[in-house]
Amino acid sequence: MKKSFIHQQEEISFVKNTFTQYLIAKLDVVEVQGPILSRVGDGMQDNLSGTENPVSVNVLKIPNATFEVVHSLAKWKRHTLARFGFNEGEGLVVNMKALRPDEDSLDQTHSVYVDQWDWEKVIPDGKRNLAYLKETVETIYKVIRLTELAVEARYDIEAVLPKKITFIHTEELVAEYPDLTPKERENAITKEFGAVFLIGIGGVLPDGKPHDGRAPDYDDWTTETENGYHGLNGDILVWNDQLGSAFELSSMGIRVDEEALKRQVEMTGDQDRLAFDWHKSLLNGLFPLTIGGGIGQSRMVMFLLRKKHIGEVQTSVWPQEVRDSYDNIL
């Protein structure tokens, strides 16, 4: 049992270390330290889809403030790029750990404990557009494939990803599969192509509903791009044979500028957020234009090692019935 446990841990470390090295080199970012707590009221917390309640923390020696365990570092990263004067084309990545206790379900792919490569870059002049988003997606996908090939060479786990990732807009997807749910659409398109970047998540589609929820103040999901489509964000999805479904590895996007922020908070009824320090800084032009996202570490390891449950590659909390159903839960 000990031998198996140690081997399991070595595999996990190999995937994480290999991916980190490739990501830093190919995306041209520096690894930095990030926070676990966010001060309530400064607007730095990531509100995700807007329904999740963060873990609240009181610090004994700072009695006049309340803190929350971060959901992600989407806003902190942009603030940090501005604070330390990162130039165009430069960026950072954080080995982020977070808690999301309001997950709808604790299942094969969802855990209370979240670990991500949380990255952000300053956009070069004139490149706040769909072409640059796609270029960045292709870079990250190359990192995923290089890591998969390294895993194949070391552990004899056959590489399955296609050489190229396929791009499709959510508007195209709902037109192609009008009778399917968003998740069913993802399954259909990802099974066909193997790896997909789904563009434009957060805005209302022609069927009257968004593909999925997104907070209004980090990704730009409203800017018109091409052919009447909208959104400068999206998800990297791969086909997971172990689960028989599409599998999200990353959510990312070009971040809101002043106009997109004002437009999106009005659409979601979150204008009160504009009173936060972070949002004021953005509206006053103090932040650079950026692109960023999160790449799930445990999800990446789970996929590349062909595991059936995320609990096989991370230590978290699970209902007893989950532990009873899977022998290799950590």
Swiss-Prot record:
Q: Which Gene3D superfamilies match?
A: Bira Bifunctional Protein, Domain 2 (3.30.930.10)
Any one Gene Ontology molecular-function term assigned to this protein's record = ATP binding
- CDD domains associated with the record: AsnA
EC assignment: 6.3.1.1
Which PROSITE patterns would you find in this protein's record? AA_TRNA_LIGASE_II
The subcellular location is: Cytoplasm
Superkingdom classification of source: Bacteria
| Record field: catalytic activity | L-aspartate + NH4(+) + ATP = L-asparagine + AMP + diphosphate + H(+)
Q: Which SUPFAM superfamilies match?
A: Class II aaRS and biotin synthetases
| Known pathway | Amino-acid biosynthesis; L-asparagine biosynthesis; L-asparagine from L-aspartate (ammonia route): step 1/1
Question: What InterPro entries does UniProt report for this protein, alphabetically?
Answer: aa-tRNA-synth_II, aa-tRNA-synth_II/BPL/LPL, AsnA
GO biological process terms held by the UniProt record: L-asparagine biosynthetic process
**Is Amino-acid biosynthesis one of the keywords UniProt gives this record?**
yes
**Is Membrane one of the keywords UniProt gives this record?**
no
Gene Ontology cellular-component terms listed = cytosol
Provide the alphabetized UniProt keywords: Amino-acid biosynthesis, Asparagine biosynthesis, ATP-binding, Cytoplasm, Ligase, Nucleotide-binding
Family statement drawn from the similarity comment of this UniProt entry = Belongs to the class-II aminoacyl-tRNA synthetase family. AsnA subfamily.
Task: State the name under which the record lists this protein.
Answer: Aspartate--ammonia ligase
